[in-house]
Every structure is written in C-alpha cells, then in structure tokens.
Amino acid sequence: MQRALASLPAPTPVRWWMWGIWGDLPAPNVFFPFGEKDAARLLHILGAYEGELERNDYRRLLTGRASANAALGSERVFGFGTPRASALPYAEVLTEVRRVGHRWMASRAHLLDEGPLPDERFDVDLTAWLDAPSVRQLVGPIREVLDENAG
C-alpha cells in the first residue's frame, strides 16, 4: 500500500479503509453491524476461495471475528463504556482515513451506513502510526513461508 500511495502525485485525495485481519487495528473509527443474511452471503462469497479454504477454514474466522466484533466493537470504536451499537449478531470494525495534504487524517467514530457528516472534519492525525515501520521491517520475517529456491 505504501508503495502504491508513494507513486501518486501529491496531494492526490485518497480515502483508505483498513481492515484488521492479521492483527487488531489500534484506532478503529467505523462500525458495521450485520445479520445472518449478510453472514450467509459473505460465507458464500468466501466459498470461491477453495485453495485458501483447503489450507485453513477461514469460514470459522469470518463468523468468529464478526461475533467478537459485535461484542467488543462498540467500545473499540465509540469508546470504553459505550453501550452496544447494534443488536445484530455480527459486526466488523474498520479504520477510515483520508489523505489531507501529506497527512493521514481520521474522522469521528461512526456507523458505516451513516458515514461521516458531509461537513465532518477529519482532524484525528494517524500519520505517525501509518508511516511507522511494520514489525517485518523492524525485525525481518518471523513466521513466513520462505521460498526454498531463493538465494
């Protein structure tokens, strides 16, 4: 992502939605609740990835994460002590940022279907987090499948 963004002429406006699949997002600001019908549709779509599902049953991940996010997501997005944002059984959390000049700015927390208000200021600066080196950049590969033929 960083290489793709670096190739854009500045200041190209960009909206970036991040989904924390391999680790939690430190600053989620979007909450998306969904029900059984949507979960069934997502599981059907996931079925197209036969090779990945042979390697690991990501169907369990989809419903397990979504159940956990339904329980924890409201407080992660809207703040500790916040009542649950939806009675639906599943949810996803995302971090949405916009590039403003050379900064990555987030808006207030909101439901996905609401979106930020039209005049909402994106005034939470997440640039330091997004420009920080990844763990892989800091310490190298940890648990990656390495190409045995690489030299």
Regions picked out by a protein language model, each given a short descriptive name:
Residues 1-149:
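Metal-dependent de-N-acetylase/amidase catalytic core
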